[in-house]
Amino acid sequence: MNDAYKTYVPVVGRLLLALMFILSGFGKLGNIEGTAAFIAGGGLPAPTFLAVAVGALELFGGLALVVGYQVRLAGLALGLFTVAASVVFHAFWSAPAEQQYVAQLLFMKNISVAGGMLLISALGAGPLSIDARIAAGTGTRFKPALAGNA
């Protein structure tokens, strides 16, 4: 693969994955009451606290992906959160028959996004990122072919 591909594709991938989290985070933080009611409906404790915490995680984790800062941590946190949220809120296996199809689609979409987040946590941000600049400043060279140093 050429260098342009290794340079720009990680940025595009981070932006596409981040978009869902940023918009969802803004939505949750802009409607704490509604988000808390939804969370309470899932049977979770402290719904208002969780609404704020989840909204902040999605917003700031998504922004971290956009700029390429601490993407390993952001990817891991967002990936684990997405799996947990999918199991709690899109449990198609226990949904009424008329809701199973949509719940399964949402579950599988979220699990796929979680897979992308876990890949980011393993592979890093790529060369066009704050993480790569920090690594370069500490004497560690980012090698796109290895994709493991940023």
Regions found by a protein language model. Name each.
Residues M1-G30, A40, P47-A56, F60, ...:
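Extended, low-polarity transmembrane helix blocks
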